[in-house]
Every structure is written in C-alpha cells, then in structure tokens.
Amino acid sequence: MESLHQAYTYIAQRLNIPGWDDEKVDVKKLVRLYLSKESAGQWLLVFDITDTARLETAGSSQAVSLMEYLPASDQGAIVFTTTERKTAVTLASQNIVELPPEMEQDMAQQMLEMCLISSANKPEVVDLLLKELAYLPLAIVQATAYININKITLTEYLLLLAKKKEEAAEPISTEYENVIGLTWLISFEQIRYQDMVAADYLLFMACIDPRDIPLAVLPMTLSYEKGIDAVGTLNAYSFVTKRTAESALDLHRLVHLSTHKWLKKQELLSQYNQAAITRLLEVFPDDNHWNRSKWRRLLPHAKFALLSGLSRQENNTRIALAHKLAIALFHDGRFDEAETYFDGALQSWKEVLGPEHPSTMSSIGNLALTY
C-alpha cells in the first residue's frame, strides 16, 4: 500500500493534478479519476513486481483490491510484472505473457560477453558457468561484476561457486533464489574484506524498504568520501542501482532477501534492525508542511523497519519512531493508518513509561484527533 501511495503521489505532483497536495484527499483515487478522463491523453502505467492484487494496510486486518485504484481509459494501458500467476490472472485475466525467469542460452551468452572485460574465454567454460548461474540475468550481472573487479578467470569463479554451494545450508526457496544467494554471498564476503562501510550500508538497507533509499538515510561515516566510496563499491558489484536525480538507491528484491536472510542466520537481525530504527528517527523530519515531501519518502522505510526484526522488543526509540510515523500519516490525511500507529505507541508508552508519563498523555491526545 505504501509504495502505491508514494507512486501515485509522485504521478499526481508531476501531472499537477488539482488537489494533489490536499491532505484530506485520497491521492490514489485522484490519479485514477484523472487518468480515466479523455482529457488526460495517452498514458502507460507500469506496476513492477506486483506480488498481490490485495493491498494490506499496516495494523489492519482488512485489505483493499488494487483494482479499486486502476484508471480505465481507451487511451491508456497498464502493464503488470509479477512472479505470482494468481496475481496475474486476477489483474489481467487472459491477457498474460509468460516469461521464464531464465534467459535463452544464446541471449545469456551475449549478456555475459557484454558484461565481461576480458573476452578470451573458452566456449565450454562459458557454457558451464551459464548453466551454474541458471541463465539468470541478475546472477550473470553479479558474477561478471565480481570477475571484473577481482580480475579472476571464469574457472576460478566456478570453483568459488562450487565451494559456496558445499558450504550453503538449506535451500532458500526456488532454484533461481538459490543461485542469486550464492552469487550474492561470494560478492558480499569480498565486500566485507575490502570495504566494511559498504558492507554495513548493505546490512542497514536490508532492514528498510529496498526501493528509493535516500542517500541521506544511510548511516553516518567518518568522512563524506568514505560514504561515496562505499556506495560506489555496492554499485560496482551490482548490488544497488543509483537514482541519480533523486540521490537514492534501489536494491533488487533478491539481493534484499539474501542480505536479510544472512542477518537472521548470523543472529544480527535485531542489532541492525535497531540501528535502522535509530537512524530513521534521527533523520525523520518534524510535521511541518514544508517537510512533507521528505517524510513522505521515509514512510515506507519507517514502516518496514518497525515491522522487521525478530523480537520487536519495545523501547523508547522504536516507540518514538512509531509516534513520528503516526503524526506524518495524520498530516497526510491517512487517519486510519495514523490511528493504528498512535494506538500502538500509546500502549507501548503505557507499558514502558506508565500511564501518567507526559509521552503517554501526548499519545492519548494524538489518538483522539483521529476519531
């Protein structure tokens, strides 16, 4: 729900739809109505990685259908990408184009050759590597990035893959997730050896939403240059994609998943989750109207961090972030969601500080505003 809200807000702002900045207006319905009009002209909407046709609201047992927010016009078209067949049928009926996760061998070979700096490779070794990588584009990109940076041969990388496959524990989920997990692990261990700041950045990002991560949210470093170098390292290993115009980063879903699973396996998830919550609290702006674009961008990250982790043990930092999140949602006109977080913060303050504490009383007042 949060990513859809963010995307529709961006669309409404770029199209300058009247009322887009009115906190009492549901921007998702506003965009749907605008694009459904003939006067909107021709348009194309792309929903990338749509895992479900149901939109969950944090703290609520109810969900709404994505279909409620889809515009309808003879001048427009909507494209969904998804790995879930049920979702595809729900959203597109019979208008489905099935694509295998892996590439055709010839195309995969062309991609490998384009990504590699050295072109002097034996065909049989190339074929073997592609087979081990299951012809997956992301696996090919990660593997070639490692090969190029560390100046090793394809055979040496195959040996690394074999070693990590032996060391790996139980399978992650599917074959292609296992392959991505192996290429990720090889690169991540090298990053930890070469650039610990880059490794910390990646572990931090595993505890927030993987899309549109502002560079300003990343943990502080001893110097600006070290931070820039760390982002460069992650980009060189194809772990992140830069959004230059927005000064932000994106993580591929499977990179995010692999990193999150590694944290859990190493029993570090709670530690890094708490660090993410602490950092988000530091950078989350106040509810001033002029800060709206800033805190809107941080909403999905705050939500993810508060729902992530293992124990979810309540502490002042976690509760304070939930309270700030509730205030932001309230000023964004999303009163039901705000109520959920205000109520959660209130119950937590009562438990941690007692019913008469000023923070508890403040939460009671804020909760009353949502009714």
List each language-model region with its residue ranges.
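A general secondary-structure boundary signal
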Residues: Y69-A72, T360, Y371
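Canonical tetratricopeptide repeat
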Residues: I140, M361-I364
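Aliphatic-rich helical/repeat scaffold segments used for oligomerization and domain docking
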Residues: M1-Q347
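Residue register of alpha-helical TPR repeats
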Residues: A320, S359-S362, L369
